[in-house]
Amino acid sequence: MYIPSHFLETDLQKISQFIKTHPLGLMVANVDGELVGNHLPFMAPNGNIAVGSKLISHTAKANPIWKIGEKKQKVLLVFSGYETYISPSSYPTKSETHKVVPTYNYLSVHINGTLSAIQDEEDKHQIVKILTEKMESSRKDPWAVADAPKDYIETMLANIVGVELLVEKMEAKWKVSQNRPARDRQGVIDDLRGNVNDPNSLEMAREIEALGGLKPGHQESE
């Protein structure tokens, strides 16, 4: 992924929290010479995500993508969020120089790794249990795998395949107006906060506000 230095994010805790908040990843793989994408929710069973850690998910057995896991094939996993259009009209400097153009702000994490397929029934049950507990943790009345009839769960497990991704490379890009002067950033924050019905805009405003000062040596490149 192309990442100018001022957009590079290396804080593993921040990256891990972002993936926890946006677990639906786009997994891209080479299948018989063609690039194939699948959207799957991935989570880390324990702690922060880093090189050497593992992410787990599952897919329908009818989806042939799991078969690349039997070959221990390399895949690319993409997580993204808070995509927000930034208008030049947000910048106070527009009225002074008019040397401004539109752009998009976003957060993105790219993970390269080796995929493995998991067919053992107990292992699949554990994957489903972990994913369910993490997804349901914020609910007032969380659902648990044990709430469903045992024979029903067994049927469901028979029709899925677990997948595990070993993280071998991870890159994170936080494009949150680091390349704009402080007053332009404030203009963007004010503009985004006006979009009260758009969660992406409000979250992006928080990300920009968290920047503080500009990173040394920032450039105006995208």
Task: Describe these PLM feature segments.
Residues 1-222:
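Binding-site signature for planar aromatic cofactors or substrates
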